[in-house]
Regions:
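Non-catalytic interaction/targeting regions
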Residues: 1-173
Length: 173
């Protein structure tokens, strides 16, 4: 009944900003999953951030590792996945944190998943209001499926077209 089942060890870092402020960021998350005794299977995630915006730019899921209660670890295999993040930005409107692309690769660098995000019916990476008007999900090779949305002047979704080209219309009171 008093068995330990999970221990999570988070490592934090900080970037110094102006006026005595700091950006505090999670850099590592080591999870020790116990099996009701002293044996455990461990996983690790590491995170990298853009210094100017604080946006996460890379997340590495190391898969299974050998971890210790002190927070040290070593990689044990070839089950690592890396996700990179790009962002749509507009210095005119001070928009910096909307994702424009998320790409996951395996240990060998092969793409296993990708999503692209389009805002305000603009090209990828551009944004003025922040309304997500299209999302593309990678299927294989150069094939993507997409979801599209339209908005009214208040920023409310009016129509949504799913990946099978079926449209849902929304009305508001």
């Amino acid at each position: 009944a008093n068995n330990l089942y999970t221990t999570v060890i988070n490592k934090w870092d900080k970037d110094t900003l102006s006026n005595g402020r700091f950006f505090v960021k999670l850099t590592e998350k080591l999870t020790l999953n116990y099996e009701g005794d002293t044996d455990h299977r461990d996983t690790l995630e590491t995170f990298s951030y853009a210094s100017g915006t604080g946006n996460i730019v890379e997340k590495i899921n190391w898969g299974q590792v050998t971890g210790t209660a002190s927070g040290t670890y070593s990689d044990t295999g070839s089950d690592k996945f890396t996700t990179t993040f790009d962002y749509a930005t507009s210095s005119t409107y001070n928009i910096y944190a909307l994702p424009s692309r998320e790409t996951m690769t395996d240990q060998s660098g092969n793409k296993v998943r990708e999503s692209k995000f389009y805002y305000d019916t603009l090209s990828i990476g551009s944004v003025t209001k922040g309304n997500l008007t299209k999302q593309e999900m990678w299927v294989s090779s150069s094939t993507y499926i997409d979801i599209e949305k339209t908005y009214d002047t208040y920023g409310l979704v009016v129509t949504e077209k799913d990946a099978r080209d079926k449209t849902t219309t929304y009305t508001y009171d």
